[in-house]
């Protein structure tokens, strides 16, 4: 089994097996394109039952880490070709050096997507779009409340815009979205800047002025970019805990 320092904090045999396999893939102990050891050998090496290991392998296969070949050894995938955004939290836990780039990519994706679907939402359903800000007046001035409001606002705009694919992307990113949201919104000046953005977007929705959406989003991103740059330069090592 790997050195204890190399194993993430596992709370159960299944979690231990999953973390062992994922870290072994990431560190090229089980390189992309290779086959895993037999279930018996791997279960013995990790110290779990074959039943537990089999359940873990199936879960990792669903996430894109592995390909289970019936009657043949389980194959290790190239995660950059086979996996989806739902493994982002795992990647951040495995490699904090890559975390700023991954998070920056995620923020960029959110910005580009939101320009499109919020425009559609306001254009087609200004009243429903306005209703998304119903709780804004009661928004508590805490990092937790701002993080939750921000996530729900951007996610619910995908519902109003009838963009189910974008909604699924938000679902898959929820964990890391909330973690970095708490980092951003713990600063009062960040909350104040974002509150102003919410008020501007609320007014745009009230007026049904869809053509103003993209400019509003881009201006907010520009204003907050310096704050985000500072956050990404000093990400805490326990971000994934």
From Swiss-Prot:
It holds the Pfam family FadR_C. The gene is fadR. Multifunctional regulator of fatty acid metabolism. It comes from Haemophilus influenzae (strain 86-028NP). PROSITE patterns: HTH_GNTR. CDD domains: WHTH_GntR (cd07377). Its main location: cytoplasm. The lineage of its organism: Bacteria, Pseudomonadati, Pseudomonadota, Gammaproteobacteria, Pasteurellales. The keyword Phosphoprotein does not apply. Residues 11-79 form the HTH gntR-type domain. The keyword Transcription regulation applies. It is found in: Cytoplasm. This is Fatty acid metabolism regulator protein.
């Amino acid at each position: 089994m790997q050195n204890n320092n190399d194993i993430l904090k596992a709370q159960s045999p299944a979690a231990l097996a999953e973390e062992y396999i994922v870290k072994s893939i990431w560190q090229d102990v089980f390189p992309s394109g290779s086959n895993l050891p037999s279930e018996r050998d791997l279960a013995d090496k990790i110290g779990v039952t074959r039943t537990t290991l089999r359940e873990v392998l199936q879960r990792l296969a669903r996430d894109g880490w592995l390909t289970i070949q019936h009657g043949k050894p389980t194959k290790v995938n190239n995660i950059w070709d086979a996996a989806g955004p739902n493994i982002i939290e795992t990647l951040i836990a495995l490699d904090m050096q890559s975390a700023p780039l991954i998070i920056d990519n995620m923020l960029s994706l959110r910005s580009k997507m939101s320009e499109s679907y919020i425009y559609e939402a306001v254009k087609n359903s200004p009243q429903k779009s306005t209703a998304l800000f119903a709780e804004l007046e009661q928004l508590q001035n805490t990092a937790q409340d701002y993080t939750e409001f921000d996530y729900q606002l951007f996610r619910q705009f995908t519902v109003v815009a009838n963009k189910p694919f974008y909604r699924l992307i938000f679902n898959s990113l929820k964990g890391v979205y909330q973690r970095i949201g708490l980092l951003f919104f713990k600063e009062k000046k960040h909350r104040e800047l974002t509150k102003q953005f919410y008020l501007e977007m609320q007014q745009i929705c009230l007026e049904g002025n869809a053509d103003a959406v993209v400019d509003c989003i881009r201006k907010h991103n520009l204003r907050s970019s310096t704050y985000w740059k500072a956050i990404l330069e000093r990400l805490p090592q326990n971000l994934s805990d």
